[in-house]
């Protein structure tokens, strides 16, 4: 799969670890920044990653900031995005299987690389179940119109 990834300065180190895991899993990764520890604004990263997912240039996205909250709020402002904040493997599985989340958000100040890498692996490997969940996702999509 093609994965768009991005972070603000608060997620720079975790992003490096996640990129290694994605590559090891055989995914093609496009990094939308940031690339230094210099302070930056997370919406400036979230929007291009979200647009890559919505346009089909990327199959899924991963966004990382200090908490995963702000960058996810910004991404969810883009129509067609279902960004899910996950700091445990259960949520990573459920957000894909039940909610068809297309962007994963995480916080570097909340979790370490070991857990983050497990979350990313599950997020990438879990498919949307459809069925009763498809009806619910369609209702979410209808809210954007």
Regions found by a protein language model. Name each.
Residues 2-6, 10-13, 89-145:
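C-terminal binding/interaction regions
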Residues 45-63, 67:
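Short, structured active-site "lid" loops
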Residues 28-39:
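A short beta-strand-loop structural module common to alpha/beta enzyme folds
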Residues 63-64, 69-109:
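Mid-chain, well-packed structural core segment of small domains
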Residues 13-24:
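Short, solvent-exposed amphipathic alpha-helices that sit
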Residues 2-3, 58-61, 80-82:
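Short active-site oxyanion
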Residues 1-2, 23-24, 49, 58, ...:
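SAM-dependent methyltransferases
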């Amino acid at each position: 799969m093609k994965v768009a990834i991005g972070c603000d300065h608060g997620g720079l180190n975790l992003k490096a670890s996640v990129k290694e895991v994605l590559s090891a899993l055989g995914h093609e990764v496009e990094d939308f920044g940031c690339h230094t520890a210099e302070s930056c604004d997370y919406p400036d990263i979230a929007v291009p990653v979200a647009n890559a997912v919505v346009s089909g240039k990327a199959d899924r996205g991963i966004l990382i900031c200090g908490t995963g909250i702000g960058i996810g709020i910004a991404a969810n402002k883009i129509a067609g995005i279902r960004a899910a904040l996950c700091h445990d493997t259960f949520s990573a599985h459920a957000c894909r299987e039940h909610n068809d989340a297309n962007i994963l958000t995480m916080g570097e100040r909340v979790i370490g690389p070991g857990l983050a890498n497990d979350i990313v692996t599950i997020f990438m490997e879990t498919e949307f179940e459809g069925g009763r969940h498809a009806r619910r996702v369609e209702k979410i999509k209808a809210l954007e119109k």
